[in-house]
UniProtKB/Swiss-Prot annotation:
Induction: Induced by heat in shoots, but suppressed in roots. Repressed in roots in response to cold, drought and salt. Its main location: membrane. This is Protein CYSTEINE-RICH TRANSMEMBRANE MODULE 8. It is a single-pass membrane protein. Mostly expressed in stems, siliques, roots and flowers and, to a lower extent, in leaves. The gene is CYSTM8. PANTHER family: PROTEIN CYSTEINE-RICH TRANSMEMBRANE MODULE 9, RCG49325, ISOFORM CRA_A. Residues 1-35 are annotated as: Disordered. The chain crosses the membrane at residues 48-64. GO terms for cellular component: cytosol; nucleus; plasma membrane.
C-alpha cells in the first residue's frame, strides 16, 4: 500500500451563513445584557445613607495607633 494515499484529510469551506468570527460565551454566572426566558425578574435594591459616624472614625484612628505602637 502507498502510505501517502492513506495520510490525507479533507477540508470543508465554512458555511456562508456565519455572521462573523466565533466568540466564546461569557463565564458561568457572568451577567449579560440579554434576558433569558425563565429568568426571574431582577429585584430593586434600596440603599440607605448611614450618615457620618464619628465612632467609626475614632475606632479607626485608635486601631492605627495601637498597631503603630505594637510594630
Amino acid at each position: 500500500m502507498n502510505q501517502s494515499a492513506q495520510n490525507y484529510f479533507s477540508v470543508q469551506k465554512p458555511s456562508e451563513t456565519s455572521s462573523g468570527p466565533y466568540t466564546s460565551p461569557p463565564p458561568i454566572g457572568y451577567p449579560t445584557r440579554d434576558a433569558v426566558v425563565g429568568d426571574p425578574p431582577a429585584a430593586a435594591v434600596e440603599t440607605n445613607s448611614k450618615g457620618v459616624n464619628p465612632e467609626g472614625c475614632c475606632a479607626a484612628i485608635c486601631c492605627c495607633c495601637v498597631l503603630d505602637a505594637c510594630f
